[in-house]
Amino acid sequence: MAKEYKTITQIAGPLIFVEKTEPVGYNEIVNIKMGDGTVRRGQVLDSSADIVVVQVFEGTGGLDKDCGVIFTGETLKLPASVDLLGRILSGSGEPRDGGPRIVPDQLLDINGAAMNPYARLPPKDFIQTGISTIDGTNTLVRGQKLPIFSASGLPHNEIALQIARQASVPGSESAFAVVFAAMGITNEEAQYFMSDFEKTGALERAVVFLNLADDPAVERIVTPRMALTAAEYLAYEHGMHVLVILTDITNYAEALRQMGAARNEVPGRRGYPGYMYTDLATLYERAGIVKGAKGSVTQIPILSMPGDDITHPIPDLSGYITEGQIVVARELHRKGIYPPINVLPSLSRLMNSGIGAGKTREDHKAVSDQMYAGYAEGRDLRGLVAIVGKEALSERDTKFLEFADLFEDKFVRQGRNENRTIEDTLEIGWQILTHLPENQLGRIDNKYIQKYHPAHRKAK
């Protein structure tokens, strides 16, 4: 039977400090017994010295030095079952939808099993999100980790929900599931997420974890690990293709900073812990495809850049670990364009692995490159027009200036419930490219122009 210690020496913020007489494991779960018989759970953060540091999930309010501490010898585990699908849970895995507790097939350590790098397969299959700026120009590939860089006041939550509703792997026989984890959200946002999932029917194939802003910061650190453990279970035990959406990683990083300050750690850049890069990697690197497994785990972490600063440590470090970024732009949002995704600073490093003949369409890469080039030139010309006026532009420059407006209005802009197939996206791309003279389509092979250009199709 586990011993009960009454050796709490200090209580600081969400942490308690306990003297130990026996070895205690890192990440071990702790039960804290209060005077009225109430039991709270905690987790060991540091056991390297004679004093054990324990973070308390429910907060330390009401605790005193006379409380009993029991080290369980177990790590935090997720009750894993296929019954997770269709459920809305708290950040620590407790039911938030009024339903019964999950009856587990397995109890899985939320820190995940180590993935052998040699067993990883390169991502190569296209995932259709139904959003043209992602599918057409910054394609998401199965097994990839592709973050969305947003900022406060921008509609990243709406984009996340739209992807959760619409995402699919065209032509795949395996089932598709979404694991959605929200961290540090308000009650209003939680109600919005819950009602959207239930109203649209997306909940049937989803597992939702919601950690509220007034929940303990400690739970915020647990939430993404709960979500990723659920995703790995569905992918590797049930052969499903799982898309994990984590929002907002900034709130997660703030919780890390708060915990570091409570432990009197030496801070790194802008007060964040020096190990934040490593910690974020333990989340992002759980995406992938494993040799011999039918399923896969794909990640879309969403983070709001403090002060719209892409060089802030959170987006900066995330960019080193992940495989590209989708950038949500305030400028496009001010124009009333949804989704306000700016394709120029956006990038999917694995895009070329997931597009082309047999995956999307043979002309996909060429159309994407040509739209990028045309839009970039049009944006540059807007700066020139602001100085010299439109009258100074040549006919060619005027065409590119108009193309930039067309690109934003026809290609970028789409409805919040508009689910475009990859064929729809490429067709819109070709329609707006007709505004440019054919001799300016230098990035598209002539055989694709003859086959797909609307002017040539009409002629046939």
UniProtKB/Swiss-Prot annotation:
The GO terms this record gives for MF are: ATP binding; proton-transporting ATP synthase activity, rotational mechanism
Which cellular component, as a GO term, is one annotated location? plasma membrane
**Primary residence:** membrane
Q: Which UniProt keywords apply?
A: ATP synthesis, Cell membrane, Hydrogen ion transport, Ion transport, Membrane, Transport
Q: Where in the cell is it found?
A: Cell membrane
Indicate the secretion signal residues.
Answer: none
Q: Which GO terms describe its biological process?
A: proton motive force-driven plasma membrane ATP synthesis
Query: What does UniProt report on the pH dependence of this protein?
Result: Optimum pH is 5.2 for ATP hydrolysis.
Spell out the InterPro entries in the cross-references.
ATP-synt_VA_C (IPR055190), ATPase_a/bsu_AS (IPR020003), ATPase_A1-cplx_bsu (IPR005724), ATPase_F1/V1/A1_a/bsu_N (IPR004100), ATPase_F1/V1/A1_a/bsu_nucl-bd (IPR000194), P-loop_NTPase (IPR027417), V-ATPase_su_B/beta (IPR022879)
Topology relative to the membrane, per the entry? Peripheral membrane protein
Regarding protein family, the annotation reads: Belongs to the ATPase alpha/beta chains family.
The free-text function statement in the UniProt record for this protein reads: Component of the A-type ATP synthase that produces ATP from ADP in the presence of a proton gradient across the membrane. The B chain is a regulatory subunit.
Q: Which PANTHER family match?
A: V-TYPE PROTON ATPASE SUBUNIT B
Question: HAMAP family, alphabetically?
Answer: ATP_synth_B_arch (MF_00310)
Subunit (UniProt): Has multiple subunits, A(3), B(3), C, D, E, F, G, I and K(x); there may be a few other subunits as well.
Q: Reproduce the miscellaneous comment text.
A: This organism has both a Na(+)-translocating F1F0 ATP synthase and this H(+)-translocating A1A0 ATP synthase.
What is the name of this protein? A-type ATP synthase subunit B
Q: Which organism is it from?
A: Methanosarcina mazei (strain ATCC BAA-159 / DSM 3647 / Goe1 / Go1 / JCM 11833 / OCM 88) (Methanosarcina frisia)
Task: Give the gene symbol.
Answer: atpB
